[in-house]
Amino acid sequence: MTIETSVQRIARLTPLEAILASFQSRIAAVMPRRTPLSQALGAVLAADVQPPECPPRPIALRDGFAVAAAEIAGAGPYAPMPLGLTACRVDVGGALPSGTDAIVPLDAISLRGDRAEAVATVAPGEGVLAAGGDAAPATALRRVGERLRALDLAAMPAAGIAEVTIRSPRLALARATAARTPVLNAAQVTLSRCAVKAGCAVSEASSLAEALSEGQCDALIGIGGTGSGRRDDAVQELARRGRVEAHGIAICPGETAALGFVGERPVLLVPGRLDAALAVWLLIGRHLVAKLAGGKVEDMPTILSLRRKVTSTIGMTEVIPVRCSGGMAEPLGSEYLSLTALTRSDGWILVPAESEGFAAGSEVAVNQWP
């Protein structure tokens, strides 16, 4: 029987907290750059978004007649008052003529031939959006460190914003093996889409060795080859070209993941299994990307009660998929997360390393999948 002496082995599991703490001192934010707003979805702002005054002059918030409110003071159904010489028909969004300060709605106007009369009073400013009412230079629309959302990309052009200053890490993805199995393909596609959603500029290298040798990225994620299989050598390849900080991380799934550096570039090696790759992204990858972008991970969990108990091993940080219904979260698996569990789930919960799990009925924070 042949004994393999060069196989990759995990000597110890590094706590997740230690991995995340190492980011703070070892990883710096990338340089900011200007980019068209339309291309910045998910990116982290490197400067406040300061708008010009918007609108630059008062505009109508409703269809009607622009008037000087004082000229029709006291108008009513039994005391109609003719509109003044400054009155003018305007549509929503139209600029108010000089000398007017309110909009009389059409249902408060009585037309008598070619004469328009107000049958209700309006207060100054009623039906009007003042200059700077949508946005003013003194108030940032979004601040440095915040992530741009789809709503921001829709609203900011209306305030005159065409470009923004962002930090968008260049992230390279590389397979550790030439094999193109469905599961490995799924892991790569998932990580690529997660990274793009997180504001990264993603490229795909032809091989892990090539990606480790080139310096055209800010960070690298290698997929597959982190275990002790006969063809697994991703960690050894990293050791040859850089340094391995940790091989084996106390997370589940994904415990064969590794972290290291080539020069100052961080390298995250994730298992080729879809569930493990996804868990490593959730627990480590997105924090790495957020540090490079000068932002932070922002979860907006929903608090639900656990339908049945969850057990976990002390010392391991665990990702558990859950299905949500009737205000309850039902755990769908642990350790190995099947494709069925992943696709049927509505989100995931985190079991921290210091916990043995949660009892049935416990309140848990359900996070959305990326």
Describe the function of each predicted region.
Residues 92, 175-177, 201, 219-237, ...:
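Glycine-rich beta-strand-to-loop/alpha-helix junction loops that act as flexible
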Residues 150, 228-230, 276:
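Short glycine-rich, flexible loops that bind phosphorylated cofactors or substrates
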Residues 65, 79, 87-88, 101, ...:
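Structural motif
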Residues 33-38, 46, 60, 135, ...:
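Flexible glycine/proline-rich
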Residues 1-26, 191-199, 228-229, 233-241, ...:
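N-terminal intrinsically disordered, low-complexity, charge/repeat-rich segments that act as generic
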Residues 2-161:
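Phosphate-interaction motifs
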Residues 155-216:
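Glycine-rich phosphate/diphosphate-binding loop of Rossmann-like nucleotide-binding domains
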